[in-house]
């Protein structure tokens, strides 16, 4: 998917509200 410009190393993705999910410590939108 496309990177959402957010990392999820220490905290979860805030961008999950727009369909992003954590993959390999980076938030991606599938």
Curated annotation (Swiss-Prot):
There is a cross-link at residues 1-30 (Cyclopeptide (Gly-Asp)). Belongs to the cyclotide family. Bracelet subfamily. Keywords: Disulfide bond, Knottin, Plant defense. This is Cyclotide cter-H. Disulfide bonds join 4-20, 8-22, 13-27. The keyword Disulfide bond applies. The presence of a 'disulfide through disulfide knot' structurally defines this protein as a knottin. The lineage of its organism: Eukaryota, Viridiplantae, Streptophyta, Embryophyta, Tracheophyta. Contains 3 disulfide bonds. Probably participates in a plant defense mechanism. It holds the Pfam family Cyclotide. It comes from Clitoria ternatea (Butterfly pea). The keyword Kinase does not apply.
């Amino acid at each position: 998917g496309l990177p959402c410009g957010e990392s999820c190393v220490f905290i979860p993705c805030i961008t999950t509200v727009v369909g992003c999910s954590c993959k390999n410590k980076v938030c991606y939108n599938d």
